């Protein structure tokens, strides 16, 4: 019977599964967007939301608890300094899952899992790229094409 059993096994041992999700949470927080299979993304959403909620508390004990799942100190600092401030007003639901189709090799359903408020970090880069394109000199107009004439038939030799 499957009473009170929470989570997916994903055909892995307990140690492999926990290590995989710790690595995936770290990657998600570092890059703020990763591509994975849909069942892994759904399970990762639970892990990531718990870690971000701990970071919002901001206490030393919360940092120790988050350090169990996020072993990279650089990512842990990013979580507590920038991401906790970004999600301070949001009561939950820090991640979004978008299905992107199927993988070519094994036809597994793939999804993108990303942090919800990642637009502020990407907006300045997009504006800079737009300004660079506008600064380029306009291209010269193309010369009009010559009219096409039918090819002359070769004169028959008599």
UniProtKB/Swiss-Prot annotation:
Chain positions covered by the region annotation Disordered: 119-158
Pfam families named in the record: Ribosomal_L17 (PF01196)
Subunit structure: Part of the 50S ribosomal subunit. Contacts protein L32.
UniProtKB keywords: Ribonucleoprotein, Ribosomal protein
Record NCBIfam families: L17
Biased composition (Basic and acidic residues): 126-158
Record flagged with keyword Oxidoreductase: no
KW Ribosomal protein (keyword) present: yes
Family: Belongs to the bacterial ribosomal protein bL17 family.
Single GO biological process annotation from the record: translation
PANTHER family tied to this protein: LARGE RIBOSOMAL SUBUNIT PROTEIN BL17M, RIBOSOMAL PROTEIN L17
Name of the coding gene: rplQ
Any one Gene Ontology cellular component term annotated for this protein: cytosolic large ribosomal subunit
UniProt cross-references to PROSITE patterns, sorted A to Z: RIBOSOMAL_L17 (PS01167)
Superkingdom, natural source: Bacteria
Protein's name according to its UniProt entry: Large ribosomal subunit protein bL17
Gene Ontology MF terms: structural constituent of ribosome
Gene3D superfamilies hit by this protein: Ribosomal protein L17
């Amino acid at each position: 019977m499957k009473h009170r059993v929470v989570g997916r096994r994903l055909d892995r041992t307990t140690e492999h599964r926990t290590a995989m999700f710790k690595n995936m949470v770290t990657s998600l927080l570092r890059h703020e967007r990763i591509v994975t299979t849909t069942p892994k993304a759904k399970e990762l959403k639970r892990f990531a939301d718990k870690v971000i909620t701990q970071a919002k508390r901001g206490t030393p004990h919360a940092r120790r608890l988050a350090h169990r799942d996020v072993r990279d100190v650089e990512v842990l600092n990013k979580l507590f300094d920038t991401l906790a401030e970004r999600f301070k007003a949001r009561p939950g639901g820090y991640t979004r899952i978008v299905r992107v189709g199927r993988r070519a090799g094994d036809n597994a359903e793939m999804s993108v899992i990303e942090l919800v408020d990642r637009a502020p970090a990407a907006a300045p880069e997009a504006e800079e790229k737009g300004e660079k394109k506008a600064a380029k000199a306009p291209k010269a107009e193309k010369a009009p094409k010559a009219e096409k004439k039918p090819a002359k038939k070769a004169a028959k030799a008599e």
